[in-house]
């Protein structure tokens, strides 16, 4: 599996605090069959701003430590950007990193409210050639209440990324139910760990993928864990399936 959403850099957000914790998380990810991962620290007002260049430098340092300890996990740079106007300017200025410097941007929505500018921000990103990848849509209250909201964003050209552990209830039963609904309706394009550590939000990848396979079959899971993520890492256009219109 290629993990496209991961908090593993030490001391930058609510992920690991030390390099030792980062290495332990990396080892756990490898044991759960993840061979490559895009590092996506939070890009919001809650944590100190760190430019794309700084994140790349920190990724390089962690990659060297992984190689030193023979942990076979390949890292790429990215951010998880909280939605707001002005993200295009942040990308242009080098403040915000897309996923492995590609056309794809990991975009986080507000959990409890629906930002009125959501569709406009996505439209602005697309106008600049950016494809938004909506992070963990199963956890947003508005989408939990009405999955058609996500379907509208997908029809607008956005992609959606599910957290594997949501499928086994690690984000709560409401998120688990929503995750299954979104999968069945064809609204999920890739799956990721969104791991933050071994204690706080551990990976839960293998069990989540087993549940996804039971719902959709291994072929669909392969699309969401290898083919789609590989297209993102390699900055390639991928022919994503259209959502099931049975709403």
List the predicted regions and their residue ranges.
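An N-terminally biased module of ancient metal coordination in phosphate/nucleic-acid-related enzymes
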Residues: 1-70
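Active-site neighborhood of phospho(di)ester-bond hydrolases with catalytic His/Asp-centered motifs
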Residues: 2-4, 38-40, 76-79, 133-135, ...
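Active-site beta-loop-alpha junctions enriched in small/polar residues
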Residues: 7-9, 42-43, 78-82, 110-112, ...
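Metallo-beta-lactamase
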Residues: 7-16, 148-154, 162-165
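Non-catalytic positions within long, well-ordered alpha-helices that form the structural scaffold/packing
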Residues: 30, 126, 183-184
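Extended substrate/RNA-proximal surfaces in nucleic-acid metabolism proteins
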Residues: 48-161, 239-247
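Short acidic/histidine-rich active-site segments
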Residues: 185-202
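Mid-to-C-terminal alpha-helical segments outside catalytic/metal-binding sites
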Residues: 205-206, 210-247
């Amino acid at each position: 599996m290629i993990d496209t959403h991961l908090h593993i850099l030490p001391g930058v957000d609510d992920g690991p605090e030390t390099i030792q914790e980062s290495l332990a998380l990396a080892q756990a990810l490898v044991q759960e069959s993840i061979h490559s991962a895009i590092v996506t620290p939070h890009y919001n007002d809650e944590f100190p701003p760190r430019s794309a260049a700084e994140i790349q430098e920190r990724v390089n340092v962690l990659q060297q430590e992984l190689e030193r300890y023979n942990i076979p996990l390949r890292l790429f740079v990215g951010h998880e950007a909280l939605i707001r106007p002005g993200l295009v300017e942040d990308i242009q200025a080098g403040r915000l990193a897309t996923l492995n410097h590609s056309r794809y941007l990991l975009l986080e929505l507000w959990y409890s409210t629906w930002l009125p500018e959501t569709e406009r921000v996505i439209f602005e990103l697309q106008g600049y050639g950016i494809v938004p990848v909506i992070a963990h849509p199963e956890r947003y209250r508005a989408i939990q209440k009405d999955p058609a909201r996500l379907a509208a964003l997908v029809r607008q050209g956005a992609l959606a990324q599910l957290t594997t552990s949501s499928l086994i209830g690690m984000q709560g039963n409401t998120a688990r139910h929503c995750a299954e609904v979104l999968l069945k309706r064809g609204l999920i394009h890739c799956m990721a760990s969104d791991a933050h550590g071994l204690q706080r939000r551990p990976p839960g990848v293998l069990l989540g993928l087993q549940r996804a396979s039971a719902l959709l079959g291994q072929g669909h899971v392969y699309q969401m864990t290898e083919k789609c993520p590989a297209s993102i890492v390699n900055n390639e256009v991928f022919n994503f399936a259209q959502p099931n219109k049975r709403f």
